[in-house]
């Protein structure tokens, strides 16, 4: 089992430890992310098994969370272009039905349009509604992906919590905001990994890609509103950054 982190921010890719690769990319380069990841992982998951004396290739399947728009959509499409069928999850199923907190300003993107792009790449896409703050929803999404495709070869933990608390100062941040940030940026993703680990081990391995942020390991040069970020967001991303190396130590040989 291989575990990778991809950090979105400025700077070039760099290896941060022997147990994982961290690829740092500008957000404009997200469509190249999985060209990099698929190139450096040790096997390509083109699996074969014997059936009545003939070798039969199995499908390659990826599960990308937070794929209704932006980085998640770009990852899902890149994987489809690399030959993967892709299960995609997000809160927004239909493009044009999501709005900002004001309830008026629309947010473009939905799983329906992501699946259209996956199919345009010649692969099967399967949309699943998922809310990071609802643990039952997260587990259901994993189960539905497995039920539909039969396996998951690549898990991309891209979805993050985007809501109150992310851009608050230390003085402004309260426990409720902090708990939401950790549920949506750490606990949900870790819960998804833990739920799928037995599946990955039984099927003989998988590749896990954790999307993190440069806020996990660098200090802001300015305050919030001038290029800086909230302490709660940075704390949650830093906590999630610790998952990959430990996961690699515990299960890297499986």
State each model region's role.
Residues 79, 86, 151-153, 241-244, ...:
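Conserved Rossmann-fold SDR core element
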Residues 75, 84, 145, 159, ...:
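Conserved alpha-helical elements of the SDR catalytic core
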Residues 59-60, 123-124, 151-152, 200-214, ...:
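Active-site loop of short-chain dehydrogenase/reductase
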Residues 65, 130, 152-162, 185, ...:
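Rossmann-fold scaffold of SDR-type NAD(P)-dependent oxidoreductases
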